[in-house]
Amino acid sequence: EKLSGSDLNYNDKGSTTIDHYKINNYAKEVNGNIDLRKALVKSSNTYFADQVQKIGVDSMIDVSKRFMFGQEIPFELKTAISPIPYNDKTTALELGTAAFGQGKDLVTPLQVALYTSAIANGGNMMKPHIVSEILDPSGKIIEKVTPEVLSKVADKKIMDTMKDYLKSSGDRNFAGFVKGKKVAGKTGTAEKTKDKIHSWVTVFYPVDNPTIVCTAFFEEENKIAAEMIPLVKKLVNKAIELGY
């Protein structure tokens, strides 16, 4: 929200230094001159670590609150609160690492699914439910959950731009997921320790009129997220088979 036009451009040299600490891209990949779209597609750590410095801590706290970080999510099952990883004592390095999902970031799969759904829904984060409707033995609907907006996270124009960017990421990572349809989304890999890796995959389908969000978290699987894509593909296609 704070950056636009040429502010979104960045020369990715494969690494950057913040507070005397070197941050590398995965495999130290050098992406050259990129914008936000390509940074998402290429998962450029350096782009987000440096660009977030222009945005600042206060703006990141504001955005985090709109995405329901630091707040209890109303849900039928107990779920942990995803804390806001920023405060007035946050250093430039902490801000930079949090911007690409490392550092003090702690987030639940439900939170990431809601985050993804907000982008898919043009900025509306919907209140989650386990059951959408209850049927009697004859199949008649006796109770149905009314959709409810939990948070308006950003203007539709901004979210539609993000949706388009995630489509570009999907074209690279999720091509062929569903026959004849496009899937948008993002992969993510976080290093817990040198030998323990967390992997994420989150997608929405179909791109033009989303009805499905699928988020998968693989704890300490020691595999990059791309290796987990086939499982998520099975989940999405099963949901389609069931009529969602």
Whereabouts are the PLM-identified features?
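Short amphipathic alpha-helical face segments that pack within enzyme cores
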Residues: 108-114, 227-234
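A short acidic/glycine-rich loop-to-helix N-cap element
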Residues: 218-230
